Design a protein with these regions (language model features):
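SAM-dependent nucleic-acid methyltransferase catalytic core
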Residues: 1-23
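A conserved structural/catalytic subdomain of Rossmann-like adenosyl-cofactor enzymes
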Residues: 15, 20-22, 27-271
Length: 271
């Protein structure tokens, strides 16, 4: 439907279950693509885990997700349909995908250790038509080096080459709307520019080393790595006391004036 609405009518469209029986297959193998994009089917609790354990395309070799959580099954499918050494994957996910443990945590760890994860982008709430919850975008890039070089004194900051992952927190950078919020062109440009530069931006973006992610059990919760809130600077106690004394003096003056006004008003009404 989205393709037709945007005037793209030369696409091959297949209707079916991509996990149980993918249709984009040639000569018994999954078709591969340079760009794979999608949005997880939120709220799908049952995805036929039993079929995945005997998957003929071996898409779940990093691990099989739990039967009541198919998110990483779709992510694994998308990654396996991206061209080796150059394919990229972009997927919209609920935040639980970033931090749930168990089988999902093990798959997430494997993706990080394979140096595939390129971006974790936090989006505002109520951005999508069908859900008010905040979501995130994960980008995987198969062109990243399989054996990243650790950060050294010459390159102290994390990069793609050293296995770094860019985190962007755009969850509070949006325009309120009804029934859904929106990202303006300026806000979108800021996200794209930050991703292109792949550098730290105060309270907005940070490149996190793979080792830090591993130390945090590969938890990708954005708030762990970016503090988007502006902190108050240290306050001098003596200055604070003077300010309070000044305000109290001003408050006493205002109260006296109010009492005088009320007295005058009372005298006037009694005449």
């Amino acid at each position: 439907m989205h393709l037709l609405l945007h005037g793209i009518d030369n696409a091959r469209i297949e209707h079916g279950d991509a996990l149980r029986s993918p249709h984009l297959v040639e000569r018994g193998r999954l078709m591969r693509f340079d760009i794979v994009v999608g949005q997880l089917p939120f709220g799908r609790d049952e995805w036929r885990r039993d079929a995945a354990e005997s998957d003929r395309f071996n898409r779940f070799w990093r691990g099989v997700p739990p039967k009541d959580r198919g998110d990483y099954a779709f992510i694994s499918h998308m990654i396996e349909t991206a061209v080796e050494a150059r394919g990229r994957v972009g997927v919209i996910v609920p935040h639980g995908v970033l931090f749930r443990s168990g089988a999902e945590g093990r798959i997430r760890t494997q993706l990080i250790e394979d140096n595939l994860l390129d971006l974790v982008l936090g989006l505002p709430p109520s951005l999508l038509h069908h859900t008010p919850i905040p979501t995130a975008v994960l980008v995987f890039d198969k062109s990243r080096p399989r054996r990243p070089q650790p950060c050294t004194g010459d390159t102290p900051h994390a990069t793609r080459a050293s296995g770094g992952v860019l985190f962007i927190d755009a969850s509070e950078d949006f325009e309120y709307g009804s029934p859904r919020n929106q990202l303006t062109e300026e806000q979108l440009s800021r996200i794209v520019r930050t991703y292109h530069n792949y550098q730290h931006v105060d309270r907005f973006a940070r490149v996190v080393t793979a080792q830090e992610l591993i130390n945090n059990d590969c938890n990708l919760s954005i708030a762990r790595y970016i503090d988007a809130h502006e902190h108050q600077s240290d306050v001098d106690p003596a200055t604070l006391e003077r300010d309070i004394a000044t305000l109290e003096t001003e408050l006493a003056r205002v109260r006296r004036e109010m009492a005088q006004c009320l007295t005058a008003l009372s005298d006037h009404t009694q005449r």
